[in-house]
Curated annotation (Swiss-Prot):
Avh6 is present in P.sojae strains that are avirulent on Rps1d hosts, whereas the gene is deleted from the genome of virulent strains. The keyword Transmembrane does not apply. It is found in: Secreted; Host cell. Induction: Expression is induced in preinfection structures and during infection. It comes from Phytophthora sojae (strain P6497) (Soybean stem and root rot agent). This is RxLR effector protein Avh6. It comes from the Eukaryota. InterPro entries: RXLR (IPR031825). The gene is Avh6. Effector that suppresses plant defense responses during the early stages of pathogen infection. Suppresses cell death induced by effectors and PAMPs in plant hosts. Triggers a hypersensitive response (HR) in the presence of Rps1d. Suppresses BAX-induced cell death and enhan,ced P.capsici infection in Nicotiana benthamiana. Also suppresses effector-triggered immunity induction by associating with Avr1b and Rps1b, suggesting a role in suppressing plant immunity. Its main location: secreted. The RxLR-dEER motif acts to carry the protein into the host cell cytoplasm through binding to cell surface phosphatidylinositol-3-phosphate. Keywords: Secreted, Signal, Virulence. GO terms for cellular component: extracellular region; host cell. It holds the Pfam family RXLR.
Length: 125
């Protein structure tokens, strides 16, 4: 009994001693950190244009990828990938059903093969 309690006390002391040594090592050298400024940032011209391409007249136009992304559930790229990937097809069918898309309403918006598969999925789930 004395050996186990002595071992416990020694281990606790070692852990406490090593914890304080590590924390003191982390404190050194951190006090003199300066902010890094980009040389490309000009005063007043720090506006970022994400996902857009600016033309000469100053208007932003979305790329084809961005337009496709905004088409969401019925984008051409999404429908094409659904024809190849059965897992994606099942996930999208589940989203369509959760959003209330009836097979009859989306018949003209999707390829015939996907329509048939969605009709079966809609009835089964």
């Amino acid at each position: 009994m004395r050996l186990s309690s002595t071992t416990f006390v020694v281990l606790a002391a070692v852990l406490l001693a090593s914890g304080t040594a590590v924390s003191k090592a982390d404190e050194t050298g951190v006090t003199n950190v300066n902010a890094v400024h980009s040389p490309n940032v000009l005063a007043g011209v720090d506006k970022r244009f994400l996902r857009s391409h600016h033309t000469e007249d100053g208007e932003a136009k979305l790329s084809n990828y961005d337009n496709e992304e905004r088409n969401g559930l019925f984008g051409a790229n999404t429908l094409s990938n659904m024809g190849k990937d059965t897992i994606l097809r099942f996930q999208m069918f589940t989203k369509w059903k959760a959003n209330g898309y009836l097979p009859k309403k989306i018949k003209d918006d999707i390829p015939r093969s996907l329509y048939k598969a969605y009709k079966i999925h809609y009835r089964m789930n």
